[in-house]
Amino acid sequence: DLAAAGYHAVHHSAGRWAGVAIVARQELELTEPVSGLPGELRTDEARWIEATAGGMRIVSTYVPNGRAVDTPTFTEKLTFLDAAAQRAALLGAGEQPVIIGGDLNVTRTDLDVYEPAAFIGSTHVTADERGRLEAMLEAGDLVDAYRHLHPDDQQFTWWDYRQGAFHRGLGLRIDYLLASSSIASGLEECGIARDFRKGRKPSDHAPLLCVLR
């Protein structure tokens, strides 16, 4: 129970496959919540929520997977990323620092892929997706928190359940925390909690944990 643990939340849910939330300690008020992303094609899916906390605008997002290149679902993904960049620009122009966190379903560079050659022609690695992620960073004047502190490290946040991918190190970095450049100097730590992936019936993702002072 969140309240018993000393937390509260705002959330946006849509059935089994989509949902986003922002959770904060009870002493940190969550205000001005906004659910949904202006410009997204699928308004029946819960993939974006915002709230203000601690003087910052916080976003939790879950970008569509895209499934396969040259399909309607891939087009929906690109449209969502375009809309996210537009929203990032609007938020970035405001007075509050911005943090956007979640599963973006894009690898930023080949360093974020265990074997780039294995993904040629697949989603998550295309120039269309990566270009839109960079556009979001630029539009919102955001930094990739993990890469800001670890420019050359190869660590992953997602591993397929099949073929022992986690234990073989066959992963992707597709989960991010993007922060306004104005607060990037306050990033003290940002790492991937791989031990959570070792549990019984784990998620195929591992948490990304960052400390901002």
Regions found by a protein language model. Give the residues of each.
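Structured beta-strand-rich core segments of catalytic domains in phosphoester-bond hydrolases
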Residues: 1-68
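Metal-dependent phosphoesterases centered on the DNase I-like endonuclease/exonuclease/phosphatase
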Residues: 3-6, 80-174
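Short Gly/Pro-enriched turn/cap motifs at secondary-structure boundaries
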Residues: 11-14, 39-41, 165-169, 198-200
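Conserved beta strand-loop-helix elements of the APE1-like EEP
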Residues: 16-31, 153, 165-186, 212
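Acidic carboxylate-rich catalytic motifs and surrounding loops in phosphoryl-/glycosyl-chemistry enzymes
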Residues: 35-37, 144-154, 190-194
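Surface-exposed cleft-lining segments at the edges of enzyme active sites
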Residues: 38-39, 63-81, 117-122
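Surface polyanion/phosphate-binding segment centered on an Asp-His-Pro turn
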Residues: 191-213
